[in-house]
Each structure stands twice: as C-alpha cells, then as structure tokens.
Amino acid sequence: MATTAQYLPRGPGGGAGGTGPLMHPDAAAAAAAAAAAERLHAGAAYREVQKLMHHEWLGAGAGHPVGLAHPQWLPTGGGGGGDWAGGPHLEHGKAGGGSTGRADDGGGGGGFHARLVHQGAAHAGAAWAQGGTAHHLGPAMSPSPGAGGGHQPQPLGLYAQAAYPGGGGGGLAGMLAAGGGGAGPGLHHALHEDGHEAQLEPSPPPHLGAHGHAHGHAHAGGLHAAAAHLHPGAGGGGSSVGEHSDEDAPSSDDLEQFAKQFKQRRIKLGFTQADVGLALGTLYGNVFSQTTICRFEALQLSFKNMCKLKPLLNKWLEETDSSSGSPTNLDKIAAQGRKRKKRTSIEVGVKGALESHFLKCPKPSAHEITGLADSLQLEKEVVRVWFCNRRQKEKRMTPAAGAGHPPMDDVYAPGELGPGGGSASPPSAPPPPPPAALHHHHHHTLPGSVQ
C-alpha cells in the first residue's frame, strides 16, 4: 500500500487527487537535490566573488577607496536600486533586491545589469593607471551612476564628493571627467600607497596646467607623492627671472665694503661730502646733496638708491685717481662746486655804526638800508642780512615773558619797591630819580594815590 501511494500523482496543492504528472520519488528527490546544489553552488560562487572583491578592495589600496586602479567599464542605466554592477561572470546571478535587472532597463530593477557600456571618461583616466591590474578588479567596484536610494555602500562616490566637489556620483570615472585635473593628485597619492608602484606609476596628463596644480593642492594639500610630480616646472619661470635680475645688483656686503672704502679715500683726498655731490653734478650731470653722500657712507639709503649711486661714486674715484691728486685739478673740482659766497667779515668800527643804528631802528626800510650801505661802503645785501641776523639774536637773548624788558631786580633796588612789594612806577616808566628825590616823591604821591 505504501508503494502504491508513492506513485500517486501530486497536484499543485499537494493532495493525491492532483492533476500533475507522475514522478518517481527517487527522481523527484534527485531533482530537488540538484536544484538545491545548484542554488548552493551559485550562492557560494557569488559569496566567493564578493569575498574576492572585498579582499582586493581592502588589500590593493590598504583600505583607501581610491587605491584601486580605475574601472574602465561602468554599468549603463540610472536605476534607483543602487546595487553594484555585475561583471560578465555574474550576468546569471540573483538579483540583490529581488528581480533580475535588464540591460536596457532605465530604472526599477535592483539586480545586476546584463550589459556593460564602456564610458568615455575612462579614456581620460587611462593615462593615470597604465598597469595590468585593472582587469582583475572588474566593474564591480564602481557604483551605478544614477543610483539614488540603494542600500549598498558607495565608498567611491562618497570619497569623490567629499574630496573632490567637482566629481559627480559616477564613481572614479565621474571624478576624472567632471573634476578635471583635480582628481589626479588624489589618485596618484592612493596609487603610491598601493604595493604596485612599479606597474601603476602615473604620468600627469599634458592638459594639466596651473589650474590643475592649484586645484590638486587645494583639495589634497600635503600629498607628498602628488607634490613630488606636480611641483617641477610650476613656478620656475618667475624664479629664473628674479635670479637674472639679481645677478647685476651688488650684495649688501659689497655695498657696505665700498661705502667704507669710499669714505676713507674721500677723506684722504681732502674732499668734503658736499664737494663730492657737486663734483658728480659737474662731471656726470647728476647733482647730489651733502646729505645724500652722508647717508650713503652711513648706509642709510635704500638698497635701490645705494645700487644706483655706487657706480657714480666709483667712477668719480677713478677720475680723481687718474688726476694723480694734483692741486690744480682738486681746486678746479672744488671751484666748480656750489655757488656759495664767501663769509663777510665786518670791521669793528662798521659794526659799531650798525649797532647804534639798530638801537634807533631795529627794522629799517629798504631806503634806509641803501643809505646806510652807501655811507659804510658795504653792499646792500650785506647790510640787510646783518639786520636780519641781529633781530634774530635779540629774540634769542630776550626772554619771552619779559616782553623785551630786563628783569625788575636789575633796574630797581630792593628798597625802591613800594609797601606792597610792587613797583612805585609802571614798568614802562623812565629810570627813577635819585633815592632822595624818590623818597620825597613817595611822601607826596602815595597819600594822593590812596585817596
């Protein structure tokens, strides 16, 4: 009876009255075992692939998401599932979200895509990674370009958005396409961290200019590997120009040594600083004041002015040495100097006459100065300057508080002051009479002044 029951057909509901085909129990068990083994084999293979990808993901770049060589193949479509794209060996794999995705499906499918399209942006990244390690990574390391709400992690996309704002959500290819040269330094640094430096030695693309350098350093400053390759030639032109301009200029030590030697030779030759400045104006057309020569010897001029004045002074020294120090040449150079008049010396008698006239009129008019100059046989300018100097001397000698009058103690004796300690006469009054008359005057004027 049991044997007969085994051959009863099984319907869809599992009852004995079903209309399904007859199946031997052993065949059914074998088919079920084969299906289970196939599912187990497929799951194990998928897990092995995941384990291999995870191992390569962490091992190749030492945990760095951009340490991997860039994937040259990216999945098509912008599905919202956000699953990782499958390689050619995973086209038959089970869907991560439940349904198998199609190659031409624009969205909705959460499974692996069946068709892969080569992205044009990968060509731009080919210059950065020319080694042979890209083939074993597969496209599974790159998330879907348009993935919006997937549950799978997307380290490449996140790293691209965090480190390089110019990169899109399209993974490393998006970074290379949208970020331009900015993705180069970060990738270069990650590749140097990898153990495949011999195979993945990148060379900067030719279109990387100053903008690329600045962009790379702004987002990946401190990346020594990138800086070692991107810095050469970045600013060599300016430094060469600066070095070329500094070749002709003397150093500060040379200027200091020349100023010291110039001062010693000038003093030995018997020239003053003013003579040197005027001689430069006479010989070369550049007139310099005594203050300028003094500041040059004291190293108080600016570096630029010191460099301009040094060749002129050096040439003047050569001209002076070539003259063999003859007195005629030295006097000629000194005579060609400033047009200053000699100092006038006034005789004692003439000076007394001027003093007496000054007491009468400290500030004479032009007509009076002319008459006085004619009478004393002096030049009109000499008389005018003498009166100016005499007035300045009077101002220095007279205190400002006294308003041009001597102190009270020098004019009046202590007994000649009034009872209150003040003067009996105003300060502008003429000198007082003798003591007896003053005493009598006090007796007669004080009562009247009190009344």
Curated annotation (Swiss-Prot):
Compositionally biased tracts (Basic and acidic residues): 190-199
Annotated keywords: Activator, DNA-binding, Homeobox, Nucleus, Repressor, Transcription, Transcription regulation
Tissue expression pattern: Neural tissues and testis.
Domain POU-specific: 247-321
Cellular location(s): Nucleus
Gene3D superfamilies (alphabetical): Homeodomain-like, lambda repressor-like DNA-binding domains
Induction or repression: Transiently increased in rapidly dividing Schwann cells in response to sciatic nerve transection 2 days post-injury.
GO MF annotation terms: DNA binding; DNA-binding transcription factor activity; DNA-binding transcription factor activity, RNA polymerase II-specific; DNA-binding transcription repressor activity, RNA polymerase II-specific; RNA polymerase II cis-regulatory region sequence-specific DNA binding; sequence-specific DNA binding; sequence-specific double-stranded DNA binding
Low complexity biased stretches: 134-145, 220-232
Pfam families: Homeodomain, Pou
Biological function: Transcription factor that binds to the octamer motif (5'-ATTTGCAT-3'). Acts as a transcriptional activator when binding cooperatively with SOX4, SOX11, or SOX12 to gene promoters. Acts as a transcriptional repressor of myelin-specific genes.
Protein name: POU domain, class 3, transcription factor 1
Gene designation per UniProt: Pou3f1
